[in-house]
Curated annotation (Swiss-Prot):
Residues 326-505 form the Helicase C-terminal domain. Its EC number is 3.6.4.-. This is Early transcription factor 70 kDa subunit. It comes from Yaba monkey tumor virus (strain VR587) (YMTV). SUPFAM superfamilies: P-loop containing nucleoside triphosphate hydrolases.
Amino acid sequence: MNLEIVDLFNGHVNSIPNILPHQLATLDYLVRSIIDENKSVLLFHIMGSGKTIIALLFALVASRFKKVYILVPNINILKIFNYSMDVAINLFNSEYILENIFIHSTTSFYSLNYNDNVINYNGLSRYNNAIFIIDEAHNIFGNNTGELMTVIKNKNKIPFLLLSGSPITNTPITLSNIISLMSDENINFGDIIIQGKKVFQILLNENGVNVLKNILKGRISYYEMPSTDLPKVQYHGKKFLDTRVVYCHMSKLQEKDYNNVRKLCNNEMFEKNMNNVSLAVLGQLNFINNLDILFQEQDKELYPNLKISNGILYGDELTTLNISSKFKYFIGKITSLTGKQFIYFSNSTYGGLIIKYIMLSNGYSEYNGSQGTNPKLINGKPKTFAIVTSKMKSSLEDLLNVYNSQLNKDGSQIMFLFSSNIMSESYTLKEVRNIWFMTIPDTFSQYNQILGRSIRKFSYFDISKPVNVYLLATVYADFDDDITSLEDYSLDEINTLPFDIKKLLYLKFKTKETNRIYSILQNISDTYRMPPHPYIVELVLGEIVRQFFYHHSRISFDSKELINAIQLVLPNIDMAKKYINEVVNGHFFVSNKVFDKSLLYRYKNDIITVPFKLSHERFVWGVNFRKEYNVVSSP
């Protein structure tokens, strides 16, 4: 990161269309490392810091010299990248060749390069002299995409830009895959990793630390958004190590079936079953693997006060909630909370069934669906919920547009957004005031990713109000342990604890090692001080102009203040004046604090900001913005 660029923007205004200082500073580093030196880079920027825009700005710069291939996890994130590309282009006041940029989902890229599940090696020559940008890079390994990337890297000797807010998903092994893609070193991972009996006992040894430092030195960009730009996070519940957890004590009914299932699930292979009964017990549903079979039952009794018929749950148990200590706490708590709520859960089939009918039975209506019993209202309209799963790929974008809209700032359109793992990455949620974990996440990465959907820059109009986080753990009726240290229990003792508590402790063990490695990556992150790289000088100057004319509506054409600002990048006064003349005659777009959206014009001996707005006739049949010439028809 070029700190000299950051220093150009003291008092930077972030509330207008802009490129943030750290984004420009990182862009400078990427140009020097990837384009000039042909090195691969890991962009390890914590969630919410604008990795996508940095990557797309870099793609636009690189498109002048090479073809750029961008890989994203799925079709919904592809839509986000396409939208963000329009944002990046609007901020990009320099030349680019859009035809040299190709954005693919991993599935479409797979189809493009495989024939009958075999890599089409002859077709890989198209990637010679290219650059690859991979979003959520930690997720591509262990599948065909990871295999293909390794083949392309070895065959074409091209650089990669890997984007990740959490490069370790579960264990250091994930990071080892990233290292192999970024370098030409042949690493025996048995030499750098200590392998224990449990997953959380996989550690990086001293040799591994040295390998990490030696290979990744000069290949890491680390950045974390200052917390001053974010709302305070208020964790609720009982103190648990360095966080807080809400203990949800089971009823006798839940504890009985919970224990029965646990006896059958004595190792991590059956974690799904334990996640289910930790969320809620449903009698026979807990003991079969194919839920679809039971969903076809007619009036099947699960408990005396709970039945299932054609996949529909009904009965008083959905309101007394002896089947779920978590939902008993949740339903009781939300009546006193205001604002939008985001709720994470796993096992979408089982969890989605429970959520839907508990919410309906307790007066909450389904968005664009069934109305709740005795509906609870907000502003005279039913309080609604939506459940997001991987099956919603086509409609997710529309749903999130409603959830994030200004009209829904108070949750009056959609108040409760329940989501499975599909929402753990790349999406942005706005104005969420309450975040719930109905399932304990599997990894530190997943936990941070879920929080990062909401707690991010520009997601809150008022950052003085806190965001509440509720991490719920199902526990036995008599369990009330204070857990203050990872040394409180032996491994044998941990196995006897409530499943959620055991999972939390495992998570914290893994988090300890993850944080150790992240600290190493942070320390070897590249920072330097140099004038902006020639390829991005226009972008830096453009941001200086945007910031200057936010504060100034009218100035003299030979304003010393403006000339001095430009000379920070173009020291030669003639070049500085020439640049000012070009941006004024080109009617550069700015956002002014008085006139808002404006264009720069010369009026006599002054530079003025002229406000504008786009308008159209009342009845417009069509405007095709993809054509060079547009024809607008109206009555």
